[in-house]
Amino acid sequence: MSTICAISTAPGVGGIAVIRVSGPDTFKICDRIFRPKKAGKSLSTQKAYTLTYGSIVGNNDETIDEVIAAVFRAPHSFTGEDTVEITCHGSTYIQQQILQSLISSGCRIAQPGEYTQRAFMNGKMDLSQAEAVADLIASTSAGQHRLALSQMRGGFSRELAELRNQLLHFTSLMELELDFSDHEELEFADRSELRTLADHIEQVISKLAQSFSVGNAIKNGIPVAIIGETNAGKSTLLNALLNEDKAIVSDIHGTTRDVIEDTININGQLFRFIDTAGIRETSDAIEALGIERSFKALDQAQIVILMYDLTRDLKDFEAFYQEIAPRLTNKSVILAMNKCDVLPTSSLPTFSFPTEGWHQIAISAKSKLHIAELQQLLTEVSSIPTLHQSDIIVTNVRHFEALTHALEAIHRVQEGLNSSLSGDFISQDLRECIFHLSDIVGEVTTDQVLGNIFRHFCIGK
């Protein structure tokens, strides 16, 4: 195993920077370039969790910078290996010179995510916890931070471990029955107990899988589709919500020909806004493709902002509503009446279609009138429940897919027990359920999958 080094702090100039060195030759390499302020304070002789002040030198023993070196000894470090973290001044030149000095002394530059991958390989964390490290680094809202921290601390892993241990117990008994298959009267695994266990595990896995809709919304943002006729002000509203010119705005009908997405944190909750192409009959093939994507975005949204231009014919809008009405079922709908600044409040229309349960607001996307009120309304209608520290919420697509496969396997176990299926078939489905649960924490994950997961990390992590 080679000894690796990388800058662990964010790129660019800052007050300080941290360079992490990890591997079997960490202390030998660092001692070659570290000059302690006090004699006899070489890093290889220091106790774990100590800080030593000194200098880093380069070629010809020239000082590069005065630094503080933190010592971590295996296995009690992030990677489980001997580790030194060098805190230097934040100059990019200084950082690169220290890296070059480390490389010249025997280190190599770490690959993206290699520190966390080594932590996983050395048993410091399982794969779901490693993925949570990446989520924690990328968190931009309180919800994302809370869920990533909970998963990194192992709550999800412990839940899965309990399920796997129970399944392994009964699987071993089923396998024992197969070893004594010539004695048909022998039954080591009590079928009644196994049925009770299968029902319990089915309930737990179902609950975990169902939590993904909430977890995905917290991690990637609650999907909000901005829907309306052409030139209703959808792109202008997106720009107003984001407070930037994200979408092109024009008086020409059909300007937006594709969906445009961006996220914004409102009161600690992440929303993913989707500006869609105006829905209308068209002979333009490209615009028609954009409208098709608008319908797809509408179907996937949890919240729909339905835009109505108050200066347009109400009958046209009501006809437009009839076209999309079936797609609004079970969605939170906000009817945003745009251009209220050019009409008196008394002129707001009464709609012929049912709007019970909808939220209505008069806005001006162009002048940003009542945009703050619209943002507040979005937080009120979002369906994210109040989460507690002990709640286990699935946020990762890979985990959700594995849980779905495990659920299918446990359903086959239940069906097999109800139909008195042979023990070898039931045992096979039990093993498959265990396999998919183990895949989540990385006990059976292939090198290809591991590489795909860790390459999305930053180099210094």
Curated annotation (Swiss-Prot):
Q: Where does (6S)-5-formyl-5,6,7,8-tetrahydrofolate bind?
A: 20, 85, 124, 461
EC number(s): the record gives 3.6.-.-
User: What general EC class does the enzyme of this chain belong to?
Assistant: hydrolase
Q: Which CDD domains match?
A: trmE (cd04164), TrmE_N (cd14858)
Q: Which domain of life is it from?
A: Bacteria
Cite a GO CC annotation: cytosol
- Which InterPro entries does the entry mention? G_TrmE (IPR031168), GTP-bd (IPR006073), GTP-bd_TrmE_N (IPR018948), GTPase_MnmE (IPR004520), MnmE_dom2 (IPR027368), MnmE_helical (IPR025867), P-loop_NTPase (IPR027417), Small_GTP-bd (IPR005225)
> Which molecular-function annotation in GO is an example for this chain?
GTP binding
| Residues involved in Mg(2+) binding | 235, 256
GO terms classed as biological process: tRNA methylation; tRNA wobble uridine modification
Per UniProt, the keywords (alphabetical) are: Cytoplasm, GTP-binding, Hydrolase, Magnesium, Metal-binding, Nucleotide-binding, Potassium, tRNA processing
Q: How is the cofactor bound?
A: Binds 1 potassium ion per subunit.
Q: Name one Pfam family in it.
A: MnmE_helical
Q: Where in the cell is it found?
A: Cytoplasm
Q: Which residues form the TrmE-type G domain?
A: 221-383
Cofactor(s) this protein requires? K(+)
Fetch the Gene3D superfamilies from UniProt.
Answer: P-loop containing nucleotide triphosphate hydrolases, Probable tRNA modification gtpase trme, domain 1, tRNA modification GTPase MnmE domain 2
Q: What is its main location?
A: cytoplasm
- Positions binding K(+) in this chain are 231, 250, 252, 255
Function, as annotated, reads: Exhibits a very high intrinsic GTPase hydrolysis rate. Involved in the addition of a carboxymethylaminomethyl (cmnm) group at the wobble position (U34) of certain tRNAs, forming tRNA-cmnm(5)s(2)U34.
The similarity comment for this entry is: Belongs to the TRAFAC class TrmE-Era-EngA-EngB-Septin-like GTPase superfamily. TrmE GTPase family.
Oligomer and partners: Homodimer. Heterotetramer of two MnmE and two MnmG subunits.
Kindly give the HAMAP family that the UniProt entry links to this protein: GTPase_MnmE
Q: Under which name does UniProt file this protein?
A: tRNA modification GTPase MnmE
* Species, as recorded: Parabacteroides distasonis (strain ATCC 8503 / DSM 20701 / CIP 104284 / JCM 5825 / NCTC 11152)
Lineage, broadest ranks: Bacteria, Pseudomonadati, Bacteroidota, Bacteroidia, Bacteroidales
Name of the gene this protein is made from = mnmE
